[in-house]
Amino acid sequence: MKFILLFALLTSNAFATVELTMVTNKGTINIALDDVKAPVSTANFLRYVDECFYDGLIFHRVVKGFVIQTGGLFTDLSEKPTHDPIINEAKNGLSNVTGTLGMARTNEWNSATSQFYINTADNVRLDGQYAVFGKVTGGMDVVRAIENAATHNQGAYRDVPTDPIIIQNIKRK
């Protein structure tokens, strides 16, 4: 009997998720986070979510056929102060395919804080470099609407939506 129970546990789907809803001025995006393969990134993201950190921030980088990025800037492109950076979980086996969420970072390996992106194409060249920690489970039409927004360069920033795309809130389901 113990063998059967152990076998059932080992062969079951071990993918554990935390589900969230992100409401933007373009619509709602449903998200699932992988807290098994990306526990540090997931805990970090949830810390910001629970603090309502993302409320009022914009998608500041929108590159059609690549990514939409958010999580750190206000509408005037000033940066919101963050917690300390986390370790990079880029080698967790998750791939930067369409609809997945990854941690944005600087050129420093362990520099991710609050910013994240949603892949709008299969960007497997990012695998092993940028940590994937979740996926879109509903609202890809909203992701596509954001991806297709008109953009311009503003100061030091490129690919900024002409009309701000704002996160109203991100909440756990």
Model-based region annotation:
Residues A14-K173:
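Cyclophilin-like peptidyl-prolyl cis-trans isomerases
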Residues F3-S12:
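Sec-dependent N-terminal signal peptides
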Residues M1-I4, K80:
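Low-complexity, intrinsically disordered regions enriched in charged/polar residues
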